[in-house]
């Protein structure tokens, strides 16, 4: 069984950053994806240099913080922050400019290349890259930069490499239990492909509280990720 354990939200806050690198160093986290528009983004890039075995990709966002680009009126609220929330799927009319989304996401990706770093892969905050109106954008950017993308699409776009064969998002909230890993193993132990677990380990700080409604659960995830013992035939990649 081949397993990727990806920690989302690198760059969100220093507490999140330290929680992720410690969950990598002391636990089973193998990769992370970075929000490149947040207060602790520079801190996350600094930590990357200290943990070269930790794969780091881009956590594309339209729903956390403020955009990097300045000419994006369809993406922001009157305060200049992203106007979408995690409930974007409930919108009857999204009103987004595809051109503005593409320019913003390319700017987020470019934060890596400006520092001479190639990201490992692409995924997104609240899985928004799998939203039907956005899929043409993620396809073009993935092909332009030749980067694999987190799966989770209802119909994966042609010509896009996937980061894994399966994404399991059950390790969250009430699902953060040792039983989760037992059930995952039983389900996939004979599977030939690669499974990705999405997780959100963190130490709690005030910046995290300001930007996320999922707070205490992140510390619980950290504790589980640093103490769990996986079956001997599970290969972390």
From Swiss-Prot:
GO MF annotations in UniProt: deacetylase activity; hydrolase activity, acting on carbon-nitrogen (but not peptide) bonds, in linear amides; metal ion binding
Keywords noted in UniProt: Carbohydrate metabolism, Hydrolase, Magnesium, Metal-binding
Pfam families: YdjC
Required cofactor names: Mg(2+)
One of the GO biological process terms: polysaccharide catabolic process
Binding, Mg(2+): 59, 125
Entry's EC annotation: 3.5.1.-
Record HAMAP family: COD
Family, as annotated: Belongs to the YdjC deacetylase family.
Protein purpose: Probably catalyzes the deacetylation of acetylated carbohydrates an important step in the degradation of oligosaccharides.
Name this polypeptide is given: Carbohydrate deacetylase
């Amino acid at each position: 069984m081949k397993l990727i354990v990806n920690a989302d939200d690198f760059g969100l806050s220093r507490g999140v950053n330290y929680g992720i690198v410690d969950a990598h160093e002391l636990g089973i986290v193998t990769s992370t994806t970075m929000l490149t528009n947040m207060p602790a983004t520079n801190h996350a890039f600094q930590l990357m240099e200290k943990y070269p075995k930790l794969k780091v990709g881009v956590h594309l966002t339209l729903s956390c913080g403020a955009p990097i680009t300045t000419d994006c009126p369809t993406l922001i609220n009157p305060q200049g922050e992203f106007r979408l929330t995690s409930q974007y799927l409930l919108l009857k009319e999204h009103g987004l400019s595809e051109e503005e989304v593409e320019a913003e996401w390319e700017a987020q990706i470019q934060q890596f290349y400006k520092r001479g770093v190639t990201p490992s892969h692409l995924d997104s905050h609240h899985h928004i890259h799998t939203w039907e109106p956005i899929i043409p954008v993620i396809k073009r950017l993935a092909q332009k930069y030749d980067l694999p993308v987190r799966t989770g699409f209802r119909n994966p776009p042609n010509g896009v490499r996937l980061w894994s064969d399966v994404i399991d998002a059950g390790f969250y909230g009430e699902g953060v239990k040792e039983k989760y890993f037992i059930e995952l193993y039983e389900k996939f132990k004979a599977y030939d492909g690669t499974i990705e677990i999405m997780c959100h380990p963190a130490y709690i700080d005030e910046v995290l509280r300001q930007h996320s409604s999922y707070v205490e659960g992140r510390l619980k995830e950290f504790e589980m990720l640093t103490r769990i013992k996986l079956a001997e035939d599970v290969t972390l990649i």
